Amino acid sequence: MSNEILGLKPEKMWKYFHEITQVPRPSKKEEKIRKYLVDFGEKFNLETIVDDIGNVLIRKPATAGYENRKTVVLQSHMDMVCEKNSDTKFNFDTDAIQTKVEGEWLKAEGTTLGADDGIGIAAAMAILDDTEIEHPAIEALFTMDEETGLTGAFGLSKDLLKGSILLNLDSEDEGEVFIGCAGGRDTIIELDYSTEELKSTCKTFRIDVAGLNGGHSGDEIQKGLANANKLLNRILWQADKDFGLGLSSFDGGNLRNAIPREAFAVVVVAPEDEQKLKDLVSKFEKIFKNEYHETETRLFVKIEAAEANTKIDSESFTKLTNSLYSCPHGVIAWSQDIDNFVETSTNLASVKFKGGKIIITTSQRSSEASALDNICNMVTANFNSVGAHVKHSDGYPGWAPNPNSEILEVARESYIELFKKEPKVLAIHAGLECGLIGEKYPEMDMISFGPTIKGAHSPDERILIDTATMFWDYLIDILKRTPLK
């Protein structure tokens, strides 16, 4: 354990967080973190269950005097988003996250930190380990594959949980208590293409759009962050219009729920157009820096010589650039009921060349079911217009707020007493597992809260250390106040 983490308070929560960072846990590859949690539960002689889908449930009896309180589910997810800077050598399947303290923040060296949702796991483990904290019966539920499919929540059985209160430990703004979330649906678009051999006289170059912040496509979509796929495509579209361009490859974005922060293309031009292309790239770098001078201070665009033997056919290239240009991205509608709350959005998440097809991924979110259908239809119409095949996932439900929640009132009273101010009670424009869990357990009383985490789903992910202490104090105080059965 690094000396920096060793000195953080509360020690037990940070101890477990450090251990978690040493265990590889990509989405859909939770074997190692699952074993770690099972070994932990068995070490403390706690009832430990692995369900059919791969979720882990650890039960701890109530402390003396709390046997007549309602059982509480502490819910977090095992997997983490695996993103790294292009110049960082790191294998998420085998390597341990390297953490560092920078001022008031804890972050990682060139990769995502995994505080989403490692800090939730660590808090639950610290409570399961502790012998002095007063609490009702606890069910610590650690779900699998939240980040790429909500698979654990989808596969959760309707008879596993005994608790009637659920505390979701997967929110990212201290002082905010969430009582609702958006539903969502992902989209896979496939566009066929053929290849053509390049003439020996052609010039080939790689164009990079990078240095963007990226971030969570739900929680940060309203910040006006740039989308690397959209920026790169603007260059390609304009170059083809001005002097003609060929495309050998396009690689932008990786995750459905992350705003793309890097995109790369290998392009082909006639020798006489080489300088025109370089000038255009330089021009667009200035344009982008001006357009995003407040939100993307590290943005850069560069061009360098590259090698390629083929390009895609010109018709497919035109279809691709036209459809990417017109594809909606960002906030589509704001809530008419909640001030400054995004109702509907979409994220142009990734563009890849794979197996002779161009694979484009988008992710739509909305707190209104009809609006979610509408934005999905917009994406479908856009790509159908160029002959692409479009397939939507089944999606996941939203979580309808319950302003009369008993645990919400407990949480409000606790926050006021601890911190001498009111918490903000909100809904979030992101998919929380509460929506799916609430479908299976309709009587479950749920809230979500957590410490302040910035830059989630990007290598800039960081956790504000003091708020983690506040999160811990808040969590254990809520447990002490749990309502009677």
Residue map of PLM features:
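Fold-level recognition of mixed alpha/beta catalytic cores in primary-metabolism enzymes, strongest
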Residues: 136-228, 240
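Active-site metal-coordination/substrate-binding segment of hydrolases
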Residues: 66-137, 142-164, 186, 201-204, ...
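Acidic/His- and Gly-rich active-site-bordering loop/insert found
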Residues: 3-105
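His/Asp/Glu-rich mid-to-C-terminal helical/loop segments that flank catalytic regions of hydrolases
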Residues: 158, 224-242, 271-274, 318-325, ...
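Zn-dependent metallopeptidase/amidohydrolase metal-coordination segment
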Residues: 5, 13-14, 336, 343-345, ...
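Acidic-enriched catalytic cores of C-N bond-cleaving enzymes acting on peptides and small amides
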Residues: 180, 197-202, 221-251, 271-345, ...
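Active-site-adjacent substrate-binding region
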Residues: 220, 227-250, 401-444
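A short beta-alpha structural unit
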Residues: 18-22, 265-266, 300-311, 349, ...
